[in-house]
Amino acid sequence: MVLINGVAVVAVKKKEPIVIGPIEYVKVTGHHGEARVKGKVDTGASRTSVDVWLAANIGLGPTVDVAKVKSAFLDEVRTRPLVRGVVEIAGVRFALPVTVNDRSDMRYPVLVGMDILKSGRFLIDPTKRAPKYASKTQKVDPHPA
């Protein structure tokens, strides 16, 4: 405690941000289970997005609204369902609405957007590699053959 102009000030240590890379393991939890999959961290995406197959498999939902999403590659706005879900990245859990989209032609079934990144808990290091997968949670292949 320090006295400044006669006022007691308690120094509070700010929590250090958690350093994450551009690709991280993400746990997504729904009504029927959970899955740990690799997800892409995207500072250009306003919302977190989950592949439609993965969302159905673990029971994300119900649909709470629709979101208008502008594609980075196409000059058009599309609507996507917003469903309730729980997303965990680097040990931090977020209960939030996520968009559901067909990501079968994309490398990662989850896109972590600014709705999570704005929490201020993360620092993104583009040189950091995704951690090795080590968990008792069963991995789910988001796009089975």
Regions found by a protein language model. Name each.
Residues 2-145:
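Pepsin/retropepsin-fold aspartyl endopeptidases
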